[in-house]
């Protein structure tokens, strides 16, 4: 199976890697169709992301298709086109139990701390897949980026008629 590997800052390689294992209970095997490239990927490539783990297969903004599932998976089925929630949280620590999964004590981001989607296929927890019958693969790959903006609005809770100042010249804003 083909993959792109960021060996260390400013050094990509292409490689043939082993096929992923069959999914275990609660997991899904997906085929990658689209990968978004964002500021995190650029910073990782430039060596300016202090928590990047090298070598790594980048890619966390993904449009994928479900190929198979392990036991107990109910949120997706074979053939579903999905966006991927790339933040792998434990679900058990204090932060996760309070709903602050982004503050998980064991947080790992695919494509940053662990291998991501710049490969043909990979296995991940099925709970991190969000199916859509309407969005294109290109749109599915951008859902993660949209979610960041939506979370900002949700946290700020602006009301009708409120003035909002958006500061930032980054790729997401």
Predicted regions mapped to residue ranges:
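Residues that mark the start of a beta-strand
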Residues: 2, 27-29, 163
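Residue-level recognition of beta-strand termini and adjacent short loop/turns
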Residues: 8-10, 24
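Short Gly/Pro-enriched turn/cap motifs at secondary-structure boundaries
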Residues: 7, 19-20, 53-59, 110-114, ...
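Cytochrome P450 core scaffold surrounding the K-helix E-X-X-R motif
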Residues: 40-43
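NAD(P)H dinucleotide-binding glycine-rich loop of Rossmann-like/cofactor-binding domains
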Residues: 90-167
């Amino acid at each position: 199976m083909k993959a792109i590997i960021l060996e260390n800052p400013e050094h990509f390689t292409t490689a043939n890697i082993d096929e992923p294992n069959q999914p275990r209970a609660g997991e899904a095997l997906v085929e990658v169709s689209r990968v978004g490239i964002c500021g995190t990927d650029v910073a990782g490539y430039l060596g300016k992301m202090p928590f990047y783990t090298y070598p790594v297969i980048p890619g966390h903004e993904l449009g994928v298709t479900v190929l198979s599932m392990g036991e107990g998976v109910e949120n997706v089925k074979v053939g579903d086109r999905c966006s991927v929630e790339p933040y792998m949280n434990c679900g058990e620590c204090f932060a996760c139990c309070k709903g602050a999964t982004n503050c998980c004590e064991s947080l790992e981001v695919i494509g940053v701390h662990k291998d991501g989607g710049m490969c043909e296929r990979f296995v991940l927890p099925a709970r991190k897949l969000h199916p859509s019958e309407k969005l294109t693969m290109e749109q599915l790959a951008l859902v993660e980026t949209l979610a960041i903006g939506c979370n900002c609005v949700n946290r700020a809770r602006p009301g009708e008629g409120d003035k909002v100042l958006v500061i930032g010249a980054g790729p997401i804003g």
